[in-house]
Amino acid sequence: MISLPHGGRRLALSACVYLAASLAWAADDAFQPLFPEDGPPRGWRVTTWNDLARPAEDAAWSVRDGVLRSSEQRGTWLVSEKQYEDFVLEFEIKLTTHGNSGVALRAPLKGDPAFDGMELQVADLRYNTQAKDSELTGGIYRAVAPSKQVYQPTEWNRFRIELKGPRLKVTLNDELIQDVDLGEFDQPVKRHDGSDAPPVKDRPGRGHIGFQHLSRDNEPVLIRNARIKELK
């Protein structure tokens, strides 16, 4: 029997934990891949970043070698044609130093998902050094701050978003950062033009999902292993 030193045992344990998490990530057959083929994403539309009713150039997003990539065209959403109500959404995302993205949740096909649906913010800390807590990665934009910051700059970051009724749970890199009842958030939030947007509790309970590209300096948004499971 080989005895590992303390540091070796800790490293081996960490490797086992990571392997178990990876196997759990891959095991559930109820999940459907969102981008199973290379090329233009099928079942998705490209729109402008502040109004999903306004189309943008389709070539702004594409899948290559299993990775969804934004083009240099800043200010777009890639939005699902399908609507979702209760679901688990999992994906990995990678941004560069001035990266800014987001995840549309239950968004209508008009208006700004950040205020007319919900947007889970994903942004490098260097994108906006004056950002409020609810504008940081893992926050429901300008409405619900995450409990902690575990975003890893310029690395692949793994998200699990679970929405069932008003309950939202968000796990980032195996850390729970949101576990809230959205029905408790009854205060309006300010849009970019200073007008009031509806409180989170009054946002739609069903809608579209999407991924945003708002990075600076032509820096891309990269997404892989994106999949979704609808909940009954």
Which residues make up each language-model segment?
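Bacterial N-terminal signal peptides that target proteins for export
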Residues: M1-A15
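Hydrophobic h-region of N-terminal signal peptides that target proteins for export
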Residues: V17-A26
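Carbohydrate-interacting regions of secretory-pathway proteins
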Residues: W25-K232
